[in-house]
Curated annotation (Swiss-Prot):
It comes from the Eukaryota. This is Uncharacterized protein YHL041W.
Length: 149
């Protein structure tokens, strides 16, 4: 009887170690990522309009959360976007961070009024040290840094 109880407790410990702990670790990792994303977004000057992603190793998770959270808002990211461009709906503007506030305000107004961004505005928005990818409500993603070349 004593051996049976030892075997039973060993089985429970194995279950905890091999199944429950990895799951717990993963959920803690995702929760910490989520907290960092929310903290960065809330802390920044974009807090009322923008969702800011932190540069971490799970961009697809961030993108899926951003899709859920943003819907018709603008997402500002600090991670490489090449792997997530096709995952995002076309009504989301996606940028590399940081963006000057005037630039962000212009694009925000364009986005909220659902009007096309003027070509002159696009030229004015270009920045030599950043790559901006954006999608209009009626167009697909474009890379602004290659615009006009």
């Amino acid at each position: 009887m004593h051996l049976y109880s030892i075997a039973k407790s060993t089985t429970i410990l194995r279950f905890l170690r091999h199944i429950l702990l990895p799951f717990l670790h993963l959920s803690i990792h995702f929760t910490s990522c989520l907290c960092r994303i929310i903290y960065v977004g809330w802390k920044s000057f974009w807090k009322h309009f923008f969702f800011c992603g932190h540069k971490i190793k799970t961009p697809l998770f961030i993108a899926s959360y951003a899709m859920f959270l943003a819907k018709q808002k603008i997402i500002v990211t600090m991670f490489e976007v090449s792997s997530v461009l096709e995952k995002l709906p076309q009504n989301i503007l996606l940028f590399h961070y940081p963006l000057p506030s005037k630039m962000g305000n212009n694009l925000l107004m364009s986005f909220l009024t659902q009007r096309s961004i003027d070509e002159k505005e696009i030229d004015a928005l270009l920045h030599p040290n950043a790559v901006y990818r954006f999608c209009n409500m009626r167009t697909t993603f474009r890379t602004l840094s290659s615009y006009g070349k």
